[in-house]
């Protein structure tokens, strides 16, 4: 008896890239590059268009660079349903990847009961930094702000036994926050 393990790529995958206040081109890369490396034959991407009816150029560039097969201007639960069940234009996929709001997460969980596989139910962005007095306050602040700018439901926590690090971290957050283009969202 000979046993072996064989890795086989999922033939068709769907990537959901949320819209919102910033183009998430890094999410395109984080999802499409592994799909491409794994050998997926068809990579379908759904993302809502902007107010001008167009997909942000950074999303398009990242998708083309990473080898996405098809891009559709569809967002929210409609996009999840289209990829799960297929439409006249959107092909049915075998697994859906990507973040989204609570409605997208619920839609992904629902279709995963019978139709397709999903990556995981993604929740709000969160970060917890465990630091002592040797930590760089500017780095901690940058870690906090990089997650907090994702949305008003994001959370950032500092765990420390050193009171001496707290004030410098708060000061670094204030300084960096003033330079952020998404300050209004981040400070909520």
Residue ranges and their predicted role:
Residues 67-155:
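Conserved NAD(P)+-binding/catalytic subdomain of aldehyde/semialdehyde dehydrogenases
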Residues 62-65, 119-121, 180-188:
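Short, conserved catalytic or adaptor-binding loops enriched in Gly and charged residues
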Residues 2-61:
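Conserved small-residue-rich beta-alpha loop and adjacent elements
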Residues 156-188:
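NAD(P)-dependent aldehyde/semialdehyde dehydrogenase
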Residues 30-33, 60-62, 88, 111-114, ...:
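Short, solvent-exposed amphipathic alpha-helical segments in soluble enzyme
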Residues 4-5, 20, 52, 63-66, ...:
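Structured catalytic cores of enzymes that bind and process phosphorylated ligands/cofactors
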Residues 42-44, 128, 157:
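A structural signal for isolated positions on well-ordered beta-strands in alpha/beta enzyme cores
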Residues 5, 22-25, 51-55, 79-82, ...:
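Short, well-ordered, mixed-charge alpha-helical segments that flank or form enzyme active sites
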